[in-house]
Amino acid sequence: MTFNSSLSRRRLLGLAGTAAAAAAVGRFAWAADPHAHAGHAAPAQSFALDAKGWALPAPRKLKLATNLNAICLAPVAVADSQGFFRNHNLEVEFVNFGHSTEVLLESLATGKADAATGMALRWLKALEQGFDVKLTAGTHGGCLRLIAQENGPRRFEELKGKTIGVTDMASPDKNFFSLMLKRHGVDPVRDVNWRTYPIDLLGTALEKGEIQAASGSDPMMYRLRNQPGKRELSTNLVEEYANLSCCVVGVGGNLVRKEKPVAAAVTHAILQAHAWAAQHPETVAQDFLKFAVNTNSEEIHAILNEHTHAHYSVGKAFVDEIAVYARDLKAVEVLRASTDPRKFAESIHADVFS
């Protein structure tokens, strides 16, 4: 594995439904875990031995764009040291990406990067613009939080007429909690004020009463929740969304069309890494320290335990998840009114395992 920062430093609900997908199921190890999300694969002891089913016949160099500082993506960052990429015959060069989502997706569409990981709720609006990028899998759930003062609002309904602090008006957390507000009868466009702050000032804004809730992602929101006088109003692991993936794998359209086995190999390696991380969070936490800044292994371990790294989605199940997000993003005026959620989800998906 090599590391590249040339692009700057700013970030299977199951194989089912078709005969081809059914044939592929045998190459994934399924667990009889009663706590696994319905239809999702969960890690099994044999899962780590499954790489040969998707390993390439010869070594292939590949550029993977990701945010190496995002704790929820720690399994991706340590996939190399644990041999997941190597077992798939992949020689991965990490590109620590911090540009805008549009620049990231353009890098995939133009071949500057082969694959990337990121948050669905940040990517979908950009993908609506027509980038030649395909999503291949959802990797896990969790990592978005809405925080309030202990004596502040306790339900979404109580946020009507209030102000919510965010770091970015196009952030995945703003999009997600807009969906939740809408589900609870609060119009996120007209009934709520959104105000931007640097992430390290959200707590101060709460304490001063400038905002009544703060929205963001881990690790900062995990830390904010644990401060005295703060409480978690919600996360993205609630209601219908509890069983959905928040982060996804994307690949360039050209890679899917010309080298589908490569797209399958990198996707499978990443899914393996997340499943393995669910069983070995302590090891992942230690390994991730070489990438992370301003954290420690105990915090990384604790945050990983609150995410759902044992659950992922591919194929039709993944399309179903994206369609749910697309439907609800359309309802809160993020996606165009003319967008058909199901057709949109199908158009940006590639079933690399069929």
PLM regions with names:
Residues G83, H88-N89, K112, T117, ...:
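Sec/Tat-exported extracytoplasmic proteins
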